[in-house]
Amino acid sequence: MAPRPRKRVSRPKPRATSRGRGGGDEDPFFESEPKRRRGGGRDEDIESEDSDLEGVAAAAAGGVGDDGEEEEEEEEEQETAGEKKMRIAKELLKKVTDAARRRREDDEDEDEGEEAGRRRVADILLKRQFEESGRKRMELADRILQPDPEDGFKMLVKHRQPVTAVVLSKDSDKGFSASKDGVIVHWDVETGKSEKYLWPSENVLVSHHAKPPLSAKRSKQVLALAVSADGRYLASGGLDRHIHLWDVRSREHIQAFSGHRGAISCLSFGPDSSELFSGSFDRKIMQWNAEDRTYMNCLFGHQNEVLTMDALSKDRLLTVARDRTMHLWKIPEESQLLFRAPATASLECCCFIDDKEFLTGSDDGSVELWSIMRKKPTHIIRNAHPVFRNNLNSLENNVEENGIHKPESVSSAQSWVSAIAARRGSDLAASGAANGSVRLWAIEPDSKGIRPLFSLRLDGFVNSLAIPKSGRFIVAGVGQEPRLGRWGRVRSAQNGVVIHPIRLKEESEDL
């Protein structure tokens, strides 16, 4: 006889009750979980491009009231990551639609109907998508407005010794800087609030796989910094021949990578990976994995000290060295392209513009534009940072008979292009030296050349530059001395990190 089937009894679902934190026998951990998820997800949300300089814009507008800020924060806490993305997308669509409508009204084009307006909006959104994906170069240079005389560089973080490295997080909300005295600082771009990283004891460093120092005391002088794309890891390197890995959230030392026999002069993380590249005075370039804390590969090719590097992806790396060469490394293929500097120059710094073009700065004061299709520069700006005699502390009588200031020879240490940076995927770049200015450049399409934009006044050796994704400000690491030596000194300079706003014409005006 077949067994009788059991009846399935459906239990009623418990109703959600609004209890206090101490009421009932409900576990408060599960009660607060959704709220914590919503609040914690805010750091991972997509932010608008204008958020990079909210602090500077707020200061110019007079700030926002405390009540308004509290209401806005309460609204954001109730908003999930998906809802925020949808809200930002709707705001962008509304902004583009309104701009297209104003364009039609200004042109008084009665023949352009609603369908033509929709096509215009679709073209604008498609252009935005191509720019974000890197398939089209973002045009920022023509949107830059004349700098306001009251703008100028403002001190963001002070250091006691010359700053040697400055990097920004991927969302450009946070920055990191290091100086010759070994101080590493983590700071907020908007407020300037800073926190120091504390070096552990020698015993802790040895337990983290650091080799004992060659001298009686370990040198903590930092020459290079790099932050991972996810913002979890900070890497530092310097005279002690180790790459030190730090946890950004806790600011604690995690690991010390050993393998180089010379000072660590440059570091770079892959844009979308945990792979870390390091360059050293021992002429080697090494590849590490910060997530697994392992050594991966070693690249040979330079015949002298490696100075700077820039990683486009985990597959492409750009390096320059004192052997007057630049190498473009193709990591998976284990191959490299060799570029030689002009006869009068020794390359000092480099950066990617996109996957086809890159920039370098030289010790003869020139800025070079390179293409992957040519072994020589496609365009050279000579004497990009001229030095006048009144800027040289060691010289007097700096005026000729006709009263004209005479530029010093570009072989002066104050005219060396010591730092160069570009907003990746755009036509905006910047270079710095010790001649008293940071210069902004426009990169012409199809390797046609470099066009000067503006010169921003700044005293001291510009040892590092960084431009955020929005292109709305520029950060510089400044010191009285150059990054890798003491062959020059600008006594009027202040050691620290400075920031300068870049005012952009609204995109709606160009639609």
UniProtKB/Swiss-Prot annotation:
Keywords: Nucleus, Repeat, Ribonucleoprotein, RNA-binding, rRNA processing, WD repeat. Residues 81-105 have a biased composition (Basic and acidic residues). The keyword Manganese does not apply. SMART domains: WD40. GO terms for cellular component: nucleolus; small-subunit processome. Residues 1-18 have a biased composition (Basic residues). It is found in: Nucleus, Nucleolus. One of its GO terms (biological process) is rRNA processing. WD repeats lie at residues 158-197, 217-256, 259-298, 301-339, 342-380, 412-451, 457-497. InterPro entries: G-protein_beta_WD-40_rep, Rrp9-like, WD40/YVTN_repeat-like_dom_sf, WD40_repeat_CS, WD40_repeat_dom_sf, WD40_rpt. Residues 1-117 are annotated as: Disordered. GO terms for molecular function: snoRNA binding; U3 snoRNA binding. It comes from the Eukaryota. Residues 44-53, 66-80 have a biased composition (Acidic residues). Component of a nucleolar small nuclear ribonucleoprotein particle (snoRNP) thought to participate in the processing and modification of pre-ribosomal RNA. Essential for embryogenesis. Belongs to the WD repeat RRP9 family. This is U3 snoRNP-associated protein-like YAOH.
